[in-house]
Amino acid sequence: DVYKRQGTNPEQLFGIGYSACFIGAMQLAGAKLGIPVPREVAVDAEVSLGKTDGGATYALGVNLHISLPGLPAEQQRQLVETAHQTCPYSGAIRGNIDVEFSIA
């Protein structure tokens, strides 16, 4: 059965790459905005694979769970919005994959 295979699947690999890239984009955004990014910054990408409305094709969805401990909510929002505009992964999938953010 294809679902019982061991190892990493493509969705997990995409999530790992997106998470790492988004952390880098937040660090660049922090430097640009003058907002210090905490050392404990974390991004966990939850990538889902599902059928489209018609059921004929598959599509990805992403929820980035972002932890920026110690920063005020407004600074967290600014970092995430700016990073989303500059992150290469965000740019590559813009308009094709829905991305949601959960900021803690």
Regions picked out by a protein language model, each given a short descriptive name:
Residues Q6-A20, G24-A104:
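Short, polar/acidic, helix-capping and beta-turn segments at strand->helix junctions
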Residues V2-Y3:
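Short, small-residue-biased leader/transition segments that mark boundaries at the very start
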